[in-house]
């Protein structure tokens, strides 16, 4: 997948959403550092030109700046990725600065923060109230000032996305945040149409579920009627020559 995408995109984010769309977890909270490293290694084997960023999962960086550095440095050393991403509440500013000062490129994440879904009230758009909108803007500015090279803006209104983009001097990458951001990102299985239900902000650019379903149906039918394997799929015995 990474090899196919590589020539068409500037950046590949190995996001902790893989816990839900690949491993079937109910949220990103159960994703481990080992899972992120495994998937990061796989992406790095396929990607040759895109900037590869790997998420630090829940519980791997919040306890202290030192914990964050240990996790981030391990991810970078074991995967070979170029940067890490952390969700950026007010608590994260000092952590971002600490990491950047020690050579870890950091992408931040504001707005809807899936790792904090239990305290934010679930997966829903953020910033519809003035107080929360102001908090999102402040978090983005703080993350930029702390040294983040880019910020993901998720699940906010067009107005908030525009304010964030205008307020920071780093690229804003939107997901459910309108075209007011400098760039866009989507969860690949969502974008490829692997699931019936996707968030409102997703556009399905393919219908992989239908293609896969039809392929499996055809395969099963041909196995049952013995039309597969056919002549083109067989190896022929060749008697040894004396």
Residue locations for each model-derived region?
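Alpha/beta enzyme core
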Residues: 1-240
């Amino acid at each position: 997948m990474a090899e196919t995408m590589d020539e068409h995109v500037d950046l590949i984010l190995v996001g902790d959403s893989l816990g839900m769309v690949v491993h079937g977890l109910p949220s990103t909270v159960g994703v481990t550092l080992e899972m992120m490293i495994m998937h990061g290694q796989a992406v790095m084997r396929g990607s040759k030109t895109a900037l590869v960023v790997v998420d630090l999962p829940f519980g791997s960086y919040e306890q202290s700046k030192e914990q964050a550095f240990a996790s981030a440095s391990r991810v970078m050393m074991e995967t070979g990725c170029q940067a890490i991403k952390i969700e950026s509440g007010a608590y994260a500013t000092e952590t971002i600065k600490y990491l950047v000062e020690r050579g870890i490129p950091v992408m931040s994440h504001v707005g809807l923060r899936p790792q904090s879904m239990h305290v934010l009230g679930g997966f829903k758009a953020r910033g519809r109230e003035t107080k929360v909108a102001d908090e999102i803007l402040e978090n983005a500015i703080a993350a930029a000032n702390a040294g983040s090279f880019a910020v993901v803006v998720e699940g906010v209104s067009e107005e908030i996305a525009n304010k964030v983009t205008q307020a920071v001097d780093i690229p804003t990458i939107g997901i459910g945040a309108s075209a007011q951001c400098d760039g866009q990102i989507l969860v690949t299985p969502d974008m490829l149409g692997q699931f019936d239900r996707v968030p409102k902000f997703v556009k399905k650019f393919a219908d992989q579920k239908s293609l896969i379903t039809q392929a499996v149906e055809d395969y099963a039918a041909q196995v049952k009627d013995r039309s597969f394997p056919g002549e083109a799929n067989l190896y022929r015995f060749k008697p040894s020559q004396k």
